[in-house]
Amino acid sequence: MNILVIGRGGREHAIAKKLQREDKVKTVYCAPGNPGMSGDNIRTVPISEEQQTELIQFAKDNQIDWTFVGPETPLIEGIVDAFQAAGLLIFGPTKAAAIIEGSKSFAKDFMQKYQIPTAEYRVFRRLAPALEYIEQQGVPIVIKADGLAAGKGVVVAETKTAAKRALVAMMEDQQFGASGQTVVIEEFLQGEEFSLMAFVSNEKVYPMVIAQDHKRIFDGDAGPNTGGMGAYTPVPQIPEEAVQQAISQVLKPTAKGMVAEKRPFQGILYAGLIQTATGPKVIEFNARFGDPETQVVLARLESPLSEIISSLLVKEQPTIAWNELASVGVVVAAEGYPNQYKTNLPLPEMSGETIYYAGVTRSEQALVSAGGRIFLAEATASTLEEARKKVYQTLDNYSFPGMYYRKDIGVKGLI
């Protein structure tokens, strides 16, 4: 079969690479992809994610059997609806269903309605009452831009000054444009975070193995939030009982609730969870694979991804098997990220390693950096300790000036 993957990051590289290795897959195209993907026989297509008409035409012209959407923005802009209207098979939620990620206020109200465990919250559309609420509630407190903000729209404020500064930046200074005109303010939850993703087809939920990602830029979870600096799986400090609880109290009622709301969800549902004293609670929902969690979770998927998605697209039950291995992925970023950083850093040739490229471009035949997060190095082994050793050994061998990465990815799992 011929498959089109939409997106350009490390997540899409991992999805495309997984598909490319499977027996029933003939060609994997990635639009627009990135130059780092071509070494894996993935054909990149110079059409960007928002060019719906051109993508539909490409799918028709190239006998694409089905399309997979990686990033959130095209989903929220209705790419699935457009493909379906053109009579094409595509795996991902419609615009109506992708709102679970596109609007945090929708997601919070939805969770309240369907009794899905989450933090206490209030939604504000005006600055003055939001500032007043901070005065009443005290800190620490969490402030979230309602719409998409590339993973950077959440502030955990330790002081009232920081909380107010975040509100002014979002609501008055338009830091995230329209995304920050409405904000959600919620209680700060204490506990261990984990990511639980699932293949979803209307009310049917097929959970994946859990992972833990590292959002902060510095070791020890210090510094500002990023798009993610690394991930690992399994997460031994999260008991199996908590995972089962999250499946029954979060994923299943969410899938059912979306059907009840006439927003049936088909695609990848991602629950960002925190294990509290009273069980798992939802921090956020995403309507797609997480990045960097995908790069480690797919390393543990034994069944062909192409067959799972092909089954779901025709409403058949897929066969899904996971291995017992451990996987650790470490993001290499440009020094200074997520603030000011240099681009055009020359990258070393990396052969035989599992590297998923993100912010890269080609300059005179060589790969150079073109973004904050440049690539993710992944290693799989029988234990987390071994996988950590392997991945950091790779990074030691391939160091280059201007690179930065966290040294503690997966340490929390070494219990």
Region locations from a protein language model:
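Active-site "cap" helix and flanking loop/linker of ATP-utilizing ligase/carboxylase catalytic domains
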Residues: 247-269, 286-344, 350-352
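Internal nucleotide-binding/catalytic subdomain
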Residues: 157-290
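ATP-binding N-terminal substructure of ATP-dependent carboxylate-amine bond-forming enzymes
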Residues: 1-95
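Active-site nucleotide/adenylate-binding loops and adjacent lid/helix of ATP-dependent enzymes
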Residues: 4-5, 102-182, 212, 236, ...
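General beta-strand structural signal in soluble alpha/beta enzymes
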Residues: 30-31, 68-69, 90-93, 120-123, ...
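Peripheral (often C-terminal) accessory segments that flank ATP-dependent C-N-forming ligase machineries
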Residues: 310-415
